[in-house]
């Protein structure tokens, strides 16, 4: 009765794992697969001198590719954060490259530090929650399905991906975090087979 148009993710299986970058000045950084709405962090293992913390220079010293609208800022004297204006693109691999020589007395090999992260793809997973006999029609069923997404999605995006093989009166409820979407369909007629 209910037919979902699910997006299929093309998974690239790589035999070897990528080695994490190292810098004697870096304590932590964003890596792995993140939400499109998550800020990106670069955390140093020592403080940046106050006279070297010039917010206006951050755009020149730290680059993100592919280029993304947003803002780099000093969160404190050890942390740089990038917050996208709206969101990162779905299912995209990003690289951040920072010139550390403006903040630390680096050796030539440690002048630049770069790291990568990826964003979640648009995927749907549906679970049938319940099938009950309709109270007003013993030949009809009430069905409830939950649709889960790995990242926050707006209701219009999820609803546009779900199709029905028959005319149905569907009611949607979406969780505040945008990752759980519940659909209720009332009085689906029983099949004749």
What is the meaning of each model-derived region?
Residues 1-7:
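Bacterial N-terminal signal peptides
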